[in-house]
């Protein structure tokens, strides 16, 4: 199970014992100090991997004296699809703003005069990487439910999952450049490649998922936005 760390927002992956209960799962915490238990009290969204398949889940505290949660797996109907589409655009907008803030640091003045540039960029990168990792982990879980509701989206969803892995590796490379003492020109070049790849990823996702989630149809074949 993956939860968002209640203090840092970073993804926390924990192996937990779940008990099926109809279409739901029950998970019990040994004590109040269990990190994942505190995470779910702060934010009830989780990604539950069952037999290698990720599922988006919403955690509801158990009633009575039992310490744990009922995990409701995501199901996509018309109303939920529209809500997912709206939230997707909100998340993409937030991530684009963080990218813009990092680019502003790069464009803020001559590199030679900006001794704090690397530190500032690293701060933006850490924030962005944590947010993006959490976004993609939750998407991977949601994709399972979206594919069940919209089988025609299967090719696009598989491509998006592969791109999540590519983006993760590219961000690790960028982080390594920022942590080191290499040329900041190389940092800018890598940053622009990452930013361009992410924008292409966001645009492809929006072009292929939003029509189906909003009930306006599924493309006959995956759409690759031009431009």
Label every model-predicted segment.
Residues 1-30, 124:
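Short beta-strand segments
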Residues 2-5, 15, 47, 138, ...:
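Generic hydrophobic/packing signal
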Residues 8-10, 34, 47, 66, ...:
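A broad, structure-centric signal for solvent-exposed, well-ordered loop/edge residues
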Residues 9-10, 28-29, 37-40, 135:
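Short histidine-centered beta-strand/loop micro-motifs
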Residues 30-31, 44-46, 161-163, 227:
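Short, charged/polar low-complexity linear motifs in solvent-exposed/disordered segments
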Residues 69-227:
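Small-residue-biased structural context
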């Amino acid at each position: 199970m993956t939860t968002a760390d209640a203090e840092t927002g970073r993804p926390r992956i924990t192996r937990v014992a779940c008990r099926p209960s109809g279409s739901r799962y029950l998970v019990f915490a040994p004590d109040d100090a269990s990190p994942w238990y505190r995470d779910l009290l702060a934010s009830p969204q989780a990604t539950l991997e069952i037999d290698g398949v990720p599922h988006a889940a919403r955690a509801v505290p158990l009633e009575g004296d039992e310490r744990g949660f009922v995990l409701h797996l995501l199901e996509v109907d018309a109303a939920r699809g529209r809500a997912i589409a709206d939230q997707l655009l909100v998340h993409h907008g937030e991530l684009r703003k963080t990218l813009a803030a990092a680019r502003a640091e790069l464009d803020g003045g001559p590199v030679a005069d900006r001794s704090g540039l690397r530190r500032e960029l690293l701060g933006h990168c850490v924030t962005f990487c944590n947010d993006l990792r959490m976004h993609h982990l939750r998407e991977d879980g949601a994709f399972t439910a979206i594919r069940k509701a919209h089988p025609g989206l299967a090719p696009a969803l598989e491509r998006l999952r592969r791109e999540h892995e590519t983006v993760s590796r590219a961000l690790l490379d960028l982080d390594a450049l920022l942590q080191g003492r290499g040329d900041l020109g190389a940092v800018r070049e890598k940053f622009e490649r990452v930013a361009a790849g992410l924008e292409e990823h966001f645009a492809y996702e929006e072009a292929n998922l939003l029509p189906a989630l909003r009930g306006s149809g599924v493309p006959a074949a995956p759409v690759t936005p031009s431009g």
